[in-house]
Amino acid sequence: QGRLEVMATLALAAPAKCAYELERAVDLFGARSALLPATAGGRPLDGPEFDGLFAVAEKLGLLLFMHPVSAESPTRFPLYGVQVLVQWPFETTLAVTRMIFEGVFDRHPGLQLLLAHGGGNLIFLKGRLNSAYEATGWEADPYYRKHVSKAPGEYYKQIFFDTCSLSPESVGFTIEVAGADRVMFGTDYPFDIGDPEAKRALPALNRLEENARIEEVHDEVLELFMDL
């Protein structure tokens, strides 16, 4: 077997057809994973119309790689690349937070996501999301328990986070919160603000037991992407 495998691209405008096309990509082309935008043209992914797609991914054991493609008008963020620097990680954060509280991971306990850009702010918001679920008294909001069976942070066990948060400190904290087995090396290539030579990620990764980390990453990639 070679080093390259097929990743399907999901066009979410027609969710039912998208689920069919995902199965077809597996049957015809041997896809092992699929690229998932953070929204369907601005529409959240937590609605029941997307359950068929997630059910197919769950049934076939496919990893869904969520990478935002902004539906916002660039005129709102005209300078400094703010759309890429800030809005994309925020879109991922919002998308997955909604998926958690709307019960997507409860309905699909075998669903596995890989999040670009270190998962946006999800790692840093874990305690805040949990506190909303655990709140009592006047702060308690029934919505935070309506569709979930456990604290939001528990669903992070269905999520992989890449190392493209782009600082040793943030990568290190991601490993601390999510666990080394839920962190996957990424470069964000070919974007200019990525980490193609791992200069930002390696200082954090090197703090781990090197041989154990190499073995974990190796096994993760082979299992998730290459079916070995």
Regions found by a protein language model. Give the residues of each.
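Short glycine-enriched loops at secondary-structure junctions
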Residues: L12, P68-E72, Y189-F191
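Active-site mouth loops of central-metabolism enzymes
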Residues: L4-A16, P44
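Short beta->alpha linker loops
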Residues: L10-A13, H117, S165-L166, E216
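Mid-to-C-terminal alpha-helical segments outside catalytic/metal-binding sites
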Residues: Q1, Y20-R24, L111, F161, ...
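Catalytic pocket-lining loop regions of alpha/beta-barrel enzymes
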Residues: V26-M184
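Conserved catalytic cysteine-centered active-site region
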Residues: G2-E5, R32
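Conserved adenosyl
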Residues: A11-A14, A19-Y20, R24-F29
